[in-house]
């Protein structure tokens, strides 16, 4: 199982003291909150065919890939899980990994010098994923491969995971053997920058409504966007532009995959009687810490 990208949250307070378990109080220096891990489920299956003699590489087997997709969706329908949509980029990543397994003559989720699964998928597709998983196998044909995968609990769990909605399939044929890679993911909606800001703003106003506080005025602040993009560029919270912004406002910074959801315990800060207005600054970016992308968010409050 691969460790997943962490989601960070930090709070810069100009005046007063605020304490909550899921936030980090910052003054002159930045820092990271505890990682909130998402999982990338991985499993490996090596049937008896793995011991047969090596046979030269033939080609990708698109027919086997299509059959594996159909069989997976049939099994998912029986289990009440949504259908998987084939993603061309994820399939390129799966094929490349299947060819690497053939070249190494072994099954693995990551060979020496090879990028991690999230990094491979990020390099191959433009869709934003918040979950990834992978099955690899070696078998004689696609139908038997699917049957064997379904008999293995961790592989079956990946195939039937209701959270997954996209898949990439790669099958390399080598004589009578198939090197099989199934890369699963949960693709998030593709929001415009304005939509992201609107969703965050709606969440802020909902907190005010739920806590029976007066509605905050929303204002545009270009410095908040600049601060958010500075965090994305630095791949960390608490950059110099954030601290400069914090000289004038109370600033909450965090990373998120879901703009409609505020950080845990943010309502404690947002329900303050002393607040009158807010602005939202965002920047979407793929970084080393977040290879499949994340929203960097700056909320300024006064």
Which ranges hold each PLM region?
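Extracytoplasmic and endomembrane cell-envelope/extracellular-matrix remodeling and assembly machinery
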Residues: 174-198, 202
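Intrinsic disorder/low-complexity segments in short proteins, especially the signal peptide
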Residues: 6, 16-18, 28-30
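Signal peptide processing junction and immediate N-terminal pro/mature segment
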Residues: 22-39
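A well-ordered secondary-structure block
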Residues: 2-3, 31-34, 116-183, 239-302
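Short, well-ordered surface patches within globular domains
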Residues: 37-40, 44, 48-120, 156, ...
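A broad detector of the eukaryotic-type serine/threonine protein kinase catalytic domain
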Residues: 80-81, 141, 188-189
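N-terminal Sec-pathway targeting helices
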Residues: 1-12
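Bacterial N-terminal signal peptides
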Residues: 11-22
């Amino acid at each position: 199982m691969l460790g997943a990208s962490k989601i960070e949250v930090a709070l810069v307070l100009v005046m007063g003291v605020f304490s909550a378990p899921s936030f980090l109080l910052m003054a002159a220096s930045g820092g990271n909150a505890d990682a909130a891990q998402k999982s990338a489920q991985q499993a490996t299956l090596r049937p008896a065919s793995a011991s047969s003699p090596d046979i030269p590489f033939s080609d990708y087997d698109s027919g086997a890939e299509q059959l594996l997709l159909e069989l997976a969706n049939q099994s998912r329908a029986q289990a009440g899980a949504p259908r998987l949509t084939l993603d061309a980029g994820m399939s390129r990543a799966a094929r490349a990994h299947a060819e690497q397994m053939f070249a190494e003559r072994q099954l693995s989720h990551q060979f020496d010098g090879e990028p991690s699964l999230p990094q491979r998928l990020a390099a191959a597709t433009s869709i934003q994923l918040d979950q990834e998983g992978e099955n690899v196998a070696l078998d004689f044909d696609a139908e038997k491969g699917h049957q064997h995968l379904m008999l293995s609990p961790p592989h079956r769990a990946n195939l039937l995971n209701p959270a997954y909605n996209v898949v990439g399939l790669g099958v390399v044929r080598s004589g009578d053997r198939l090197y099989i890679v199934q890369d699963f993911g949960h693709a998030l909606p593709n929001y415009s920058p304005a939509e992201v800001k609107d969703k965050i703003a709606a969440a802020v106003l909902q907190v005010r409504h739920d806590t029976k506080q007066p509605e905050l005025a929303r204002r545009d602040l270009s410095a908040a966007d600049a601060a958010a993009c500075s965090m994305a560029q630095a791949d960390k919270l608490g950059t110099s532009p954030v601290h400069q912004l914090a000289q004038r406002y109370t600033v909450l910074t965090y990373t998120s995959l879901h703009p409609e959801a505020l950080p845990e315990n943010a309502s404690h800060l947002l329900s303050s009687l002393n607040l009158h207005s807010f602005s939202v600054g965002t920047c979407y970016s793929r970084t080393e810490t977040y290879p499949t992308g994340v929203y960097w968010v700056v909320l300024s409050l006064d």
